[in-house]
């Protein structure tokens, strides 16, 4: 008695060259950023400006790693629901760390140009806007982990950067 086996072709993911190049760029960027942060700390000699540059660089690298590492994994293995969720959470974390990045940049500007004073109201507006943006980023209605997102909240949370 012959038995007929039905073998379905597996849908094997094969990365395309542009995707591989993007993954290489993303990995190189994260490595460069991490090395730059370490160098800022090593050579800071206790100078607050260079310590702030190191913190700024680590903030950028850390936030970007949350969405770039899943992108690199997606390039290598293909996509699935877990990767989509990691990318969504990564974009949310990156959005929050970018806000912190701009706050740190304000302090770097203050230390770089001590003769230029920021009016207290401007500093307050920047801090309030940053807090507002972070709160907006935390709303589940942003749909970070879905394909559709939320255009209205995207505009609101990014308007503070305008």
Language-model features: where?
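Membrane-proximal helix-loop-helix units in multi-pass membrane proteins
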Residues: 94-162
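Early transmembrane hairpin module of multi-pass membrane proteins
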Residues: 19-37, 43-118
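Membrane-interface segments at the starts/ends of alpha-helical transmembrane spans
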Residues: 13-18, 150-154
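Short, Lys/Arg-rich, polar N-terminal cytosolic tail immediately upstream
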Residues: 1-16
């Amino acid at each position: 008695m012959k038995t007929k086996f039905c073998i379905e072709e597996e849908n094997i993911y094969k990365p395309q060259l542009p995707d591989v190049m993007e993954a290489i760029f993303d990995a190189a960027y994260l490595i460069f950023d991490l090395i730059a942060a370490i160098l800022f700390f090593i050579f800071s000699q206790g100078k607050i400006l260079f310590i702030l540059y190191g913190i700024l660089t680590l903030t950028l690298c850390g936030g970007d790693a949350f969405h770039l590492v899943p992108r690199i994994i997606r390039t290598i293995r293909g996509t699935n629901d877990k990767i989509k969720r990691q990318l969504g959470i990564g974009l949310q974390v990156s959005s929050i760390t970018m806000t912190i990045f701009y706050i740190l940049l304000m302090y770097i500007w203050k230390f770089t140009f001590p003769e230029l004073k920021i009016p207290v109201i401007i500093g307050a507006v920047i801090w309030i806007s940053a807090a507002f943006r972070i709160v907006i980023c935390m709303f589940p209605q942003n749909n970070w982990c879905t394909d559709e997102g939320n255009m209205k909240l995207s505009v609101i949370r990014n308007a503070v950067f305008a």
